[in-house]
């Protein structure tokens, strides 16, 4: 039995390390990750990559930490407390990326979940341009799960190909985007469709109405899995993306298989979002999200019950999806 496994067996308690930036408002970054891990009864450790000055209105300052300090934090955590799951969030500059990659190899981390932090929900750029190719070169080979929204995924592919990918006009275009990312290394690619609305013909529409729909998608290199849902016109809640990837990592730390871990994390985040009052102020929405996530953890893991028609493989994508779209 490997050291990571023996540690978890000995303590009988799942552990997870998050490597990300600090959000002083508590709604995103390291602070969000640790809240979600606690809700899943996972022991969370943290390595700061940057200090940020931010809240629900925007970011006023990003201060990257020196790579040597990032390395010393990782060593302090993983030389003492063994774990096999690492979640990676904000990486503001490329200098720290080789350090993180070397640490993942040194400590034999098997389950790495990356949250694409290129642009914040408020539209702030969160990393230097050279960070993207450095991430693909050094970190993508380690990834079990890469999670992003459609907009950030498009930017990542654009920077990788050094040219704009085909324009996104339809559902199959989103699938093509995911398959390109999968070929870069991650075993599972997760795209949240919050920013994209589809009409009944599976075309992307810029004028969504009550019949518009969206979907969160998972691609494992063989099949696409679709979590179809009504399109929500409200903007993202500060901390949504961090919470999703922290939930995936927490589920993995609890020995839930990857596809199920992703599926249940998507469900718990969506469950929590539905319980946020739409007329609340932005800061209070984040607070409500984490409160709801604390309750949704009751339904996570093997206890969660999902409607099979909302989570389907791509056996007959068009006919199955159209059967669920209002006519």
UniProtKB/Swiss-Prot annotation:
Cellular component GO terms, alphabetical: cytosol; nucleus
GO molecular function: ATP binding; hydroxymethylpyrimidine kinase activity; phosphomethylpyrimidine kinase activity
Residue positions binding 4-amino-5-hydroxymethyl-2-methylpyrimidine: 54
Entry keyword annotation includes Nucleus: yes
Transmembrane region(s): none
Catalytic activity: 4-amino-5-hydroxymethyl-2-methylpyrimidine + ATP = 4-amino-2-methyl-5-(phosphooxymethyl)pyrimidine + ADP + H(+); 4-amino-2-methyl-5-(phosphooxymethyl)pyrimidine + ATP = 4-amino-2-methyl-5-(diphosphooxymethyl)pyrimidine + ADP
Entry EC no(s): 2.7.1.49, 2.7.4.7
InterPro entries tied to this protein: HMP/HMP-P_kinase_dom, PM/HMP-P_kinase-1, Ribokinase-like
Gene Ontology BP terms: thiamine biosynthetic process; thiamine diphosphate biosynthetic process
Pathway: Cofactor biosynthesis; thiamine diphosphate biosynthesis; 4-amino-2-methyl-5-diphosphomethylpyrimidine from 5-amino-1-(5-phospho-D-ribosyl)imidazole: step 2/3; Cofactor biosynthesis; thiamine diphosphate biosynthesis; 4-amino-2-methyl-5-diphosphomethylpyrimidine from 5-amino-1-(5-phospho-D-ribosyl)imidazole: step 3/3
Subcellular location: Cytoplasm; Nucleus
Coiled-coil blocks: none
SUPFAM superfamilies: Ribokinase-like (SSF53613)
Annotated keywords: ATP-binding, Cytoplasm, Kinase, Nucleotide-binding, Nucleus, Thiamine biosynthesis, Transferase
UniProt function note: Catalyzes the phosphorylation of hydroxymethylpyrimidine phosphate (HMP-P) to HMP-PP, and of HMP to HMP-P.
The family this protein is said to belong to: Belongs to the ThiD family.
Protein name: Putative hydroxymethylpyrimidine/phosphomethylpyrimidine kinase C18B5.05c
